[in-house]
């Protein structure tokens, strides 16, 4: 994880963030397709398609460039961010021995992704008022809007989120 804020002046901050996420391999029963046309493999044990399969995920990379403007009172902030995330295909293998009649590569389809997003947000904080002993608790409310600009194997959905934080 790398994160750094560059404070241009008392009101404007630029931020850079990048991180790599490694997921440990996991093994569980999975329905393995027989061939590339088998989009709904059988879940019945007697059909022989349910196997103990280990998934080895690729490393996920995330990065973000952002800018924040803090109003003079310190209570309000607005920000914008550009986000890029990418992950290569996961690899699947039978935990004992791959059955040659099954299509293990089919489990990897659609596990890779790339996404470009934009985010804008507004924050209200009582921290300056709390420090000045004018408010009873340090709290913060964030409202943000995130929209997907482009992507592969990812949702094209936009979302709105509101976070309420109380520090103690």
Regions found by a protein language model. Give the residues of each.
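Loop-centered beta-sheet repeat module
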Residues: 1-27
């Amino acid at each position: 994880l790398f994160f750094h804020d560059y404070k241009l002046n008392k009101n404007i901050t630029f931020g850079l963030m990048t991180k790599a996420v490694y997921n440990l391999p996991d093994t569980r029963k999975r329905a393995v397709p027989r061939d590339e046309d088998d989009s709904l493999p059988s879940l019945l044990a007697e059909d022989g398609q349910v196997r103990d399969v280990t998934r080895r995920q690729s490393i996920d990379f995330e990065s973000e460039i952002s800018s924040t403007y803090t109003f003079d009172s310190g209570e309000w902030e607005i920000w914008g961010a550009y986000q890029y995330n990418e992950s290569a295909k996961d690899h699947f293998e039978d935990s004992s021995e791959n059955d040659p009649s099954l299509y293990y590569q089919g489990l990897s389809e659609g596990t890779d992704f790339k996404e470009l997003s934009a985010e804008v947000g507004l924050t209200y904080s009582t921290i300056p008022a709390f420090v000045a002993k004018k408010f009873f608790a340090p709290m913060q409310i964030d409202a943000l809007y995130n929209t997907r600009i482009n992507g592969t194997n990812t949702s094209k959905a936009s979302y709105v989120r509101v976070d309420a934080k109380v520090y103690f």
